[in-house]
């Protein structure tokens, strides 16, 4: 046992991911070459989607709006000619941001400017500004084209269109106000640079760059002081710190295409569970006969309980063969998706790693979980090593939460974030509906905030 503790402690220290608990304003020198991780400020409260309805069988269905989405209410304000000209100049160059000038009625705005101040100019300029602000802030892609999209973006609440237009007109700085809406992540800037250097004749590549730039706009602009972001097609998870600096990457195994595809989420790490248990889904207990088999011949590592209705509950106990491995990073959500260790570590060596039932198996999950617990629960490394090696179920709640983004980018920087833009296989075929929406005229925005697809919670999320 002491040898195992020493090995885990050594692995954790060498990884460079361990961080001594300290005040956020002071950075202590480190002896390891890994980047220093600063303690985050408390994460902003997430915006929660409406409660999910259920199917007739009682299984929860996620992503069906309770009310019909309505068109957004766009303001109309008085526009001086000079500010309208500044808006037109932005529209004329907006293709550098991966959008289309024609979407924002430049010819109508040009004609209204020529006619001079008045209601016509106010109406046209207000509409053009609102549409442009919405697309720069929230993305051009309509919700119906965002497959399995359940990451509610709060930016329209933080920077509403009315406030943006008021600011632009009060400061007479239309271009500056709109520029503040662009994503700040380095991947967005790398894609923007790639778009600028890709020949116009290469329409397929330019279209792919555009939709992946737009995917960054789907996410909240402020991703957090410290956050985790998984890119499903890349099979990678990144731990990021202030100003989008890369701390460490982790290989992942994600959901198989089809019903068990991993959805796109924005959640928070709320706890780290050492030596987790796993409640075996009924599809295995009943469908594969595991419950009856264990009743006939009990097996070490499984606890079977007969319920009052005669059904069986099977719980796999903590241990080296537990399906969740030695650690689970809990990010509560209606989909039962989380990050976890796995005893099947051979999958991390495969180039294509879409093998799970939805959850994200994470290489070196113990290192990641300990890092989260040190930063989020102020626990000393020695205690965490003891938790990990005890073999006992131990849940460590976070006093500081960390955002987790489960994203889907088919183009972006390479894994090391060196600035080189690479493509990833569209394993779930989610590009097609976004590309189709970009090939059509811009759709009017509605109040819908997530995908309307019915998604039944997976009964076996591993």
Q: Model-derived features: where do they sit?
A:
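Sec-dependent N-terminal signal peptides
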Residues: 1-24
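Hydrophobic residues in alpha-helical segments
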Residues: 136, 168-169
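Positively charged, low-complexity intrinsically disordered regions
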Residues: 5, 23, 29-32, 300, ...
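Peripheral peptide segments
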Residues: 22-25, 29-34, 457-462
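Well-ordered beta-sheet/strand-loop patches within structured domains
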Residues: 2, 47, 123, 130, ...
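Cationic-aromatic interfacial patches
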Residues: 26-154
